[in-house]
Amino acid sequence: MSKLEAILSQEVEAEIQALLQEAEAKAEAVKREAEEKAKALLQARERALEAQYRAALRRAESAGELLVATARTQARGEVLEEVRRRVREALEALPKKPEWPEVVRKLALEALEALPGAKALVANPEDLPHLEALAKERGVELKAEPALRLGVRAVGAEGKTQVENSLLARLDRAWDALSSKVAQALWG
């Protein structure tokens, strides 16, 4: 999995950098626009209105800073959502990669270890050939479930106990921590 993580990390980092540059450019444009408006207002005022102008300028600068801060926050949220979308795309492309059989086998092993005495292993029909040897070795039945993607489910006796181990579920569970690390890496 470390090779996969490295590949994903490189792809995600490149996308993050591109998105960050785009977000920063947008924020700078908004900031420049706010500064230009404030400067135009300054030039339009007469000396007699200098005190009023300064108050208006302070309000405009505060509004501009708030607008920039809001735009940055929104851009950061968009960057993180784009990162998540691209990670999901990368995960969904894994079944087409040569390392997928080993990945799905490891997911199955983890699920079986988490549920001692499992009687069945459920997976997407396309993944069943990759799991036949493991199922035979562990003495569990293989079952197909087309809706189960990028993972497996170990099922206990009578089907009452189940342990699902899928990459998308792992991403969902870990997203808060991962997004915090991505944000820290990007924005400090």
Curated annotation (Swiss-Prot):
Swiss-Prot/TrEMBL GO biological process terms: proton motive force-driven plasma membrane ATP synthesis
SUPFAM superfamilies reported in the protein's UniProt record: V-type ATPase subunit E-like
Gene: atpE
Pfam families recorded: vATP-synt_E
UniProt family annotation: Belongs to the V-ATPase E subunit family.
One GO location term (cellular component): proton-transporting two-sector ATPase complex, catalytic domain
UniProtKB keywords: ATP synthesis, Hydrogen ion transport, Ion transport, Transport
Reported function: Produces ATP from ADP in the presence of a proton gradient across the membrane.
MF (Gene Ontology): ATP binding; proton-transporting ATP synthase activity, rotational mechanism; proton-transporting ATPase activity, rotational mechanism
Protein name per UniProt: V-type ATP synthase subunit E
Keyword check for Transport: yes
